[in-house]
Amino acid sequence: MITTLADIEKGLRRQEADRRLSRVRRKLLVMSGKGGVGKTTVCVNLAVAKARAGARVGILDVDFHGPDVAGALFLEARVEADGAGMLLPVPAGENLWVLTVQHLLEDPDEAVLWRGPRKMRAVERFVTEAAWPELDFLFVDSPPGTGDESLAAFRQVPGLEAILVTTGHSLSLADAAKAASFLRAARAPLAGVVDCMGTLVCPRCGEETALYPAGAAEAFAARSGAPLLARLPWDLEAQRLSEARGKPVVEAAPDSLLAGRLRELADRL
Ligand SMILES: Nc1ncnc2c1ncn2[C@@H]1O[C@H](COP(=O)(O)OP(=O)(O)O)[C@@H](O)[C@H]1O
Ligand SMILES: [Mg+2]
């Protein structure tokens, strides 16, 4: 086989990415079996909490069909490339950088129609052909399930661990079990489970009420051989403040039960 200049350049970019990634303290992919369980909310708020605490943090969004990181950060921007064609992650306030396909689209409502190989290649480009600054933490937001995007992320990011988000509902737990099985097959470590929206904070009195059978998420975590890292309440008021103030919950409603639990979770990482 003939080695081309392009092959050599690709190899050098790979080496540089591996060198850069080896210095990142923790690389965490937020995943789930089911959709709509709170992945993007967890991912973005953990990243913001860490960045506000002084760490240098990157968010890589590999959810190409539902890229919500930009929306969850209330960050409109366009990704630029430098002279060498390297993508420049978008700054999102002090210590935080974001790379998402949403910031590459001409029309914000445009659908990304990529299939398997195109998505695998895009993840590779976001990792090896992007000028990421030196980071302490990298959070990867993923689509639900066990598809190409998450697999590509584990291939492209050495040392990547998973945080598995689920609700306490039986269907969410059943799909989470498949995600855990995927991780075992991919030999990817599971850092822990997050139970999201398993309790409800009463908007009137602030009392926290369980929505699902007690211990369901905890038992799932134990079966998966990973710790239950957090129980995040369904907090409608914190969510409302986030929307109204145009900031993630940890910034928009720092005194809420949800923000407190998210900060505790960030501290455990
Ligand atoms: N703990 C929570 N309290 C209130 N709303 C939440 C909470 N977690 C997620 N949400 C809301 O639920 C919806 C789905 O969450 P999202 O993070 O987008 O899930 P996913 O990324 O898994 O699809 C969003 O509208 C989000 O704002
Ligand atoms: Mg999402």
Predicted features and spans:
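C-terminal lobe/tail of nucleotide-utilizing enzymes
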Residues: 1-12, 180-269
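Conserved P-loop NTPase nucleotide-binding/switch module
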Residues: 140-183
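Extreme N-terminal, non-catalytic leader segments
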Residues: 1-37, 78
